[in-house]
């Protein structure tokens, strides 16, 4: 491909020129050949053509370092533009630490530590309890001349220290007084003219804020750090490594706990029942006392409507639905006539007792009228109970017995007359 590009570049153009000037063509070819940069193309990728000398992309994970010794109070003051105001005020800055300069960020001449001016909270040593002065112990072998010499040295040292401290206090007070007098127009202090605090406008504050902001990220920055890897890049800058758990010492959980939705209507401390199929496997040898469940097939027997005449005739409704092989054969019924007659006799006795009790109840209740009895007979005819009673052999025998009794009573009454 590189050879074809070279041949195409050296091939003379066949397009007609406007003025047919060969000198112009030669000059153009020389200029194009001198400005052309030949590069061998190896392959084409997502980002375009790739040459042979292209640097390989590093697969190392990205690390976002943490800014150390960051003073958020000083950063806020710089963004609001108060540093210049503090520098103009000088010694009138209130709430200033001893040994610190008026302008934050500028260390004093005596201090060599860079972090001495950082406004941190609770950095001073706290003093608690009673503080007792240690008295000097006098020994027996000390001579009076030595003791007197020591006392004289202490007195001279105290006398020399007091003027120095008073001079420092007087110097600070004098400097403050001079600054106040300079603000009223007296320039004898030598501190300059009147102190004017410059108040920045909104546009200046906005411009200062824009200048303090970092550069806007490009598309390459977003492509280099995916969204799901941004937090891990921050953790790597804080000292986290792959496979390290959370907490102190890296012994905590490695994966965050995922919240699980609680089942509906499930109280606190309750466990959800398994919703899968029940395990109906055979019991193990250890639990031999467990009996396996009966797995026989239960057939459904349909229930049909029964006729009340079957009950009156002494037949059960389920006898008609029984299969033929389960019904008793006629040969068995002929072999046992006595049992059949005994059942019939018992049934007749029950009906006779029921009729006597019903007649006795009607005779004992004088409040019943003929209209009520007629209604009951009408209901019986409508329900179809009277034909059953007439067709029943026990009811027929009762009527014959009552008619015979009536006939005997009439005969006896006729003989008496």
Swiss-Prot record:
It is found in: Nucleus. Residues 201-214, 338-351, 370-417 have a biased composition (Basic and acidic residues). Residues 281-290 have a biased composition (Polar residues). Keywords: mRNA processing, mRNA splicing, Nucleus, Spliceosome. Residues 240-252 have a biased composition (Gly residues). GO terms for biological process: mRNA splicing, via spliceosome. Pfam families: G-patch_2 (PF12656). SMART domains: G_patch. One of its GO terms (cellular component) is spliceosomal complex. Residues 352-365 have a biased composition (Basic residues). The keyword Nucleus applies. The keyword Ribonucleoprotein does not apply. Residues 1-70, 201-221, 240-417 are annotated as: Disordered. Its main location: nucleus. GO terms for molecular function: nucleic acid binding. It comes from the Eukaryota. Residues 227-273 form the G-patch domain. PROSITE patterns: G_PATCH. PANTHER family: G PATCH AND KOW-CONTAINING, G-PATCH DOMAIN AND KOW MOTIFS-CONTAINING PROTEIN. Associated with the spliceosome. Involved in spliceosome maturation and the first step of pre-mRNA splicing. Belongs to the SPP2 family. This is Pre-mRNA-splicing factor SPP2.
């Amino acid at each position: 491909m590189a050879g074809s590009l070279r041949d195409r570049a050296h091939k003379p153009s066949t397009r007609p020129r406007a003025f047919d000037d060969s000198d112009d063509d030669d000059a153009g070819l020389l200029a194009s050949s001198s400005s052309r940069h030949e590069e061998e193309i190896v392959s084409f990728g997502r980002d375009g053509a790739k040459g042979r000398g292209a640097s390989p992309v590093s697969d190392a994970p990205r690390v976002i370092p943490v800014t150390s010794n960051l003073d958020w109070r000083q950063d806020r003051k710089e963004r609001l533009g108060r540093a210049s105001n503090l520098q103009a005020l000088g010694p009138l800055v209130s709430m200033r630490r001893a040994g610190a300069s008026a302008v934050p960020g500028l260390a004093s001449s005596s201090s060599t530590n860079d972090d001495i001016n950082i406004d941190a909270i609770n950095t001073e040593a706290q003093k608690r309890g009673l503080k007792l002065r240690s008295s000097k112990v006098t020994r027996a072998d000390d001579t009076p001349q030595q003791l007197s010499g020591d006392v004289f040295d202490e007195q001279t040292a105290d006398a020399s220290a007091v003027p120095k401290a008073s001079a420092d206090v007087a110097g600070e007070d004098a400097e403050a007084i001079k600054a106040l007098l300079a603000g009223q127009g007296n320039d004898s202090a030598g501190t300059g003219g009147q102190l004017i605090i410059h108040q920045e406008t909104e546009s200046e504050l906005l411009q200062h804020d824009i200048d303090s902001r970092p550069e806007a990220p490009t598309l390459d920055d977003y492509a280099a750090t995916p969204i799901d890897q941004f937090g891990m890049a921050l953790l790597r800058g804080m000292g986290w490594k792959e496979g390290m758990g959370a907490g102190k010492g890296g012994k905590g959980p490695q994966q965050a706990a995922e919240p699980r939705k609680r089942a509906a209507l499930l109280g606190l401390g309750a466990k959800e029942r398994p919703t899968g199929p029940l395990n109906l496997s055979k019991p193990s040898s250890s639990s031999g006392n467990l009996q396996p469940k009966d797995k026989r097939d239960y057939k459904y027997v349909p229930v049909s409507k029964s006729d009340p005449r079957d009950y009156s005739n002494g037949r059960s409704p389920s006898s008609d639905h029984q299969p033929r092989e389960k019904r008793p054969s006629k040969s068995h019924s002929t072999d046992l006539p006595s049992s059949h007659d005994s059942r019939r006799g018992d049934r007749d006795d029950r009906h006779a007792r029921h009729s006597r009790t019903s007649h006795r109840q009607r005779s004992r209740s004088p409040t019943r009228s003929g209209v009520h009895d007629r209604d009951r007979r009408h209901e019986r005819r409508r329900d179809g109970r009277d034909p059953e009673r007439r067709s029943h052999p026990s009811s027929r025998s009762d009527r014959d017995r009552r008619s015979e009794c009536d006939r005997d009573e009439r005969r006896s009454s006729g003989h008496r007359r």
